[in-house]
């Protein structure tokens, strides 16, 4: 009898444990939505409803122009998912409607659309998994308002002024410093509404995944979207010189290849799907070939990211996988700038190193071609990094390589440096900030410039 009671008790215990666990697993569905208002006006919440689940964060009643907001729903019943719909409207009665369905069984699905596709664009990226996150954008095709961009470079985890940048001993101090920098930029965003950020290379110290993880951990806390490129520390300094033993990748090109693969993934899975206007890129993921350059329009300006520099090329082999072929971007750039010029845009180029490797390793013919593109297709400015020195140059024009384009160097994020660009039609004003102590301190104003 005693044994029977013990068996019954154990049986009931496991029954309770099973249903408790099942309920816990059944409730583990959520959808976090980030919505960026890239229009000219405030968006007003028109309607929001949930078919399944509850709100953990409700959609805000309004979204200021340039603002990014988040809202979230989660499951609250046994073996159910989350499903809902939210609609925002602009003053011209144009709407964006977001529908999400994250079921307990089956695939996630999303329907994001506008009732005025002639004037507006919608796009999204992400959305996979039980706890899904999607980034949604609502663009007006012809933005006329003024806007702001933060331009950065060289986060370079785990580099600081002291210590070994490749040592994990520098990890916590680097993260603390850069957490302050992010906090300062978010404060500036709350005051002045930054539409997006650009980071011009050296996203890691040597291309290692551990340092890339630190970058995302810290900089994904920015309250505005950002678009980055690679620098020499990501896929040039480490060629044939860096393995990822912890990931069982013993190729000496492991770190460089991972930097390239991650960049390609950002371009195809995020930037392109978020539907940056007139988006174009130069990389074929099928044959692993191209420069990784990409571009987009915002307002009257065409933005171009040229990665390390426009003439960089390298072959990144592997003992098991196909070779990656990084090629110069000049031919792609010529076609890209010509199309932007035909659309009536002024252009801004971004790349990492415009002072050392680009000048020293490019042929005279390549430098001549680059200058001709700048002069022919209304390139008004070039933003670079690499030197860790904030500066402006070519104020009077006539540079033998950059022509009459103004050159701005954004310093280094690991030092707290960044630039705030105020854009009015085809004119920009640029100010230098430092945020290493957690607050945005204005250092100086650079001379502005205008496109034609």
Where are these regions (language model features)?
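Bacterial N-terminal signal peptides that target proteins for export
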Residues: 2-11
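Bacterial N-terminal signal peptides
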Residues: 11-21
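Intrinsically disordered, low-complexity segments enriched in small/polar residues
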Residues: 23-144
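N-terminal active-site segment of His-dependent metallophosphoesterases
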Residues: 142-211
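Active-site glycine-centered loops adjacent to acidic/histidine catalytic or metal-binding residues
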Residues: 154, 201-202, 231-232, 352, ...
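Extended active-site neighborhood of metal-dependent phosphoesterases/phosphodiesterases
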Residues: 162, 208-332, 369-375, 381, ...
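Acidic-and-aromatic substrate-binding clefts and catalytic sites of carbohydrate-active enzymes
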Residues: 203-212, 286, 356-364
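Short acidic, glycine-rich surface-loop motifs adjacent to enzyme active sites
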Residues: 339-358
């Amino acid at each position: 009898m005693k044994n029977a009671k013990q068996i019954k008790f154990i049986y009931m215990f496991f029954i309770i444990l099973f249903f408790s666990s099942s309920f816990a697993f059944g409730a583990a569905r959520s959808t976090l939505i980030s919505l960026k208002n890239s229009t000219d006006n405030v968006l007003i919440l028109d309607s929001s409803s949930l078919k399944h689940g509850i709100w953990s964060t409700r959609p805000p009643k309004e979204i200021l122009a340039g603002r990014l907001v988040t809202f979230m729903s989660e499951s609250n019943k046994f073996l159910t998912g989350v499903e809902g719909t939210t609609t925002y409207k602009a003053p011209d009665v144009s709407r964006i409607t977001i529908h999400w369905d994250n079921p307990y069984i089956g695939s996630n699905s999303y329907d994001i659309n506008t009732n005025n596709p002639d004037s507006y664009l919608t796009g999204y990226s992400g959305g996979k998994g039980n706890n899904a996150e999607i980034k949604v954008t609502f663009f007006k095709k012809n933005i006329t308002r003024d806007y702001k961009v933060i331009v950065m470079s060289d986060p370079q985890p785990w580099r600081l002024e002291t210590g070994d940048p490749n040592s994990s001993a520098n990890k916590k101090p680097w993260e603390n410093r850069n957490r302050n920098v992010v906090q300062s930029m978010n404060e500036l965003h709350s005051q002045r509404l930054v539409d997006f950020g650009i980071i011009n290379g050296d996203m890691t110290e040597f291309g290692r995944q551990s340092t890339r993880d630190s970058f995302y951990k810290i900089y994904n806390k920015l309250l505005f979207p950002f678009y980055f490129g690679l620098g020499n520390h990501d896929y040039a300094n480490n060629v044939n010189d860096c393995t990822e033993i912890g990931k069982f990748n013993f190729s000496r090109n492991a770190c460089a290849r991972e930097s390239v693969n991650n960049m390609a993934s950002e371009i195809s899975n995020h930037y392109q799907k978020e539907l940056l206007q007139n988006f174009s890129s130069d990389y074929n993921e099928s044959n692993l070939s191209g420069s990784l350059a990409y571009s987009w329009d915002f307002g009257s300006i065409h933005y171009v990211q040229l990665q390390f520099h426009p003439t960089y090329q390298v072959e990144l082999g592997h003992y098991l996988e196909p070779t990656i072929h990084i090629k110069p971007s000049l031919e792609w750039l010529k076609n890209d700038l010509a199309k932007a010029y035909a659309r009536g845009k002024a252009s801004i180029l971004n790349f990492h190193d415009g002072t050392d490797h680009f000048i020293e390793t490019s042929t005279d013919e390549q430098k001549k071609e680059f200058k001709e593109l700048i002069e022919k297709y209304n390139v008004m400015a070039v933003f670079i990094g690499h030197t860790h020195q904030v500066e402006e140059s070519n104020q009077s024009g006539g540079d033998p390589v950059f022509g009459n384009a103004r050159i701005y160097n954004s310093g280094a994020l690991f030092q707290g440096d960044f630039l705030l660009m105020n854009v009015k039609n085809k004119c920009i004003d640029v100010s230098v900030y430092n945020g290493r102590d957690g607050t945005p301190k204005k250092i100086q104003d650079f001379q502005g410039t205008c496109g034609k």
